[in-house]
Amino acid sequence: METLASLYNDHLAELQKRAREVLTRNKLDALLIHSGELQRIFQDDRSYPFKVNAHFKAWVPVTSVPNCWLWVDGVNKPKLWFYSPVDYWHSVEPLPESFWTRSVELMPLANADDIAQQLPAQRERVGYIGYAQQRARDLGILAENVNPKAVLNYLDFHRSIKTGYELACMREAQKTAVMGHRAAHEAFLSGMSEFDINQAYLTATGHRDTDVPYDNIVALNEHASVLHYTTLDHQPPSEMLSFLLDAGAEYNGYAADLTRTYAGQSGSDFAQLIKDLNGEQLALMDTIKAGVRYTDYHVQMHQRVAKLLKSHKLVTGISEEAMVEQGLTTPFLPHGLGHPLGLQVHDSAGFMQDEQGTHLAAPSKYPYLRCTRMLQPGMVLTIEPGMYFIDSLLAPWRSGEFSQHFAWDRIDALKPYGGIRIEDNIVIHEKRIENMTRDLNLA
């Protein structure tokens, strides 16, 4: 197996190649990529948790240090100014020494403002990538070269195809997330609250709640009907009906994003519904291949949800085809099948069709689908079908021409369970699909 160092060198060579191309196309000499800056809380002396610029951590696995800078010209070694002040108030990261550091020119930056003296004097043909736009202008970057759209479109589009190094990092993130999921499931079985289940997850993964790639969704019972539920009750419910966990992990800046749903009672109708949705998710993934648009699989999943609604007698007296055509599946599956995954949880370029950034929106019928790409080898995506019992989405269907087809008594009996979501992370290969999640035997 190739070492992470050799994979990183190949990764860096690919990024250098992309940099040369995008610089030539846009008549630029170099890119100045900023890790970011701390953002102060209004009228306070504290800052919000730092979140690094994804374009920065694509080049180097530095994810928690603000005020760092990369100078990239596609030819020479990337220059990394690593922020390392003398500071007795706060802990300071030492200059890194790791598998990747010999591949860059590493220099300490004692003061954030010193970068102005470190950069070449001529900056008219330098593109800045980052969110501190005023800082870029203060450094003499021309306004049109601050986050130039053509540059970002090119880089975002190509970021969809993961290098071997990126895939290795994402597999490691999966391992960490799976450990957390197993610990959280044990906590659920022991009757813990949402808050304590989340603590068990963080302990198992070695993450702080500010380190996870997104806010953990730890939902018991009806809370699972809130798609992005993050409240975390401190007291467990009197009866544990269901548990939905949507939680991930990071490795070198790359994310895992996994979801599992469990029933409190193994013989319940809800438990059977979980089992059947799991089967449909696996069957759908058996059909996924390169060269097909992701949207097609989203539509196919609605057909599979219609099949479940019929077999569980939740919707009756109407064909599965008509259910999908008339939108009867949408209140039960209101979100998209999934999204690109990588440096960001909802990774870049889900709608981009080419290097120029041509946008293909989600179908109007499914506005919350996050990806319309043609699948290509090297892409990483989530596959996360769900079935929910959400009052606000079901309410409009309680009257009107299709109301008679909804088995409201059966649907209402499932509302205390909230809903189901099952999410795996897959890699598209030339002739197969790699399921990074199931490969680790996360049931």
UniProtKB/Swiss-Prot annotation:
Keywords annotated in UniProt: Dipeptidase, Hydrolase, Manganese, Metal-binding, Metalloprotease, Protease
Claim: Disulfide bond is one of the keywords in the record: no
Single GO MF annotation: phosphoric triester hydrolase activity
Pfam families, per database record: PepQ_N, Peptidase_M24
Residues engaged in binding Mn(2+) 2: 246, 257, 423
EC numbers, comma separated: 3.4.13.9
Residues binding Mn(2+) 1, per UniProt: 257, 339, 384, 423
Annotated Gene Ontology cellular component terms: cytosol
Job of this protein: Splits dipeptides with a prolyl residue in the C-terminal position.
Family: Belongs to the peptidase M24B family. Bacterial-type prolidase subfamily.
Name the UniProt record assigns to this protein: Xaa-Pro dipeptidase
Species name: Serratia proteamaculans (strain 568)
Phylogenetic classification of the source organism: Bacteria, Pseudomonadati, Pseudomonadota, Gammaproteobacteria, Enterobacterales
Gene: pepQ
